[in-house]
Amino acid sequence: LSTALGYIDAQYKRFVTNIAGVPTDVADFRRVQNTPKWTASGTLAYSAPVGDGDISFGTTLSYRSKTNQFEIPNPYIDQKGFALWDASLVYTAPEGRWSLGVFGKNLTDKHYKTSGYTFINVNPVTGVPILGTNGLPTSALGTEGTLTAFYGNPRTVSATLELRF
């Protein structure tokens, strides 16, 4: 059994940017990117003899709190807190000559963002997206705005066969 817990209170004391030519401290409206306040994980591993071989089981649950992709919060690409569950089962033959394993990652098939890009207009102080008459964010790159999110891997299950000679 192993556990880990992480906490970081990352924030800007000052974040000065020029708004209409005037140096303005916008620290209250900025976030340290890719820095969750909380992270946690717990792993349970068990191994037992089976005949002359060995069987091992492991499972891990990990958590990451809300993450901002950029200094300016963006409701479209920032990631809310989420948990991932992984597990494995491995049989190892006598004397370690071979092993057979099954591994699962993101077993709940959680959809989560790992990064993203945004080229939409925002209020320079608060970072709130500026919406057009159609209710959609207005573009910072001409006629088309770009808002792209990249997602983590979906549920994956794999098997391994290892031979030692």
Each PLM stretch: what is its role?
Residues 72-73, 82:
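Generic long, charged, amphipathic alpha-helical segments
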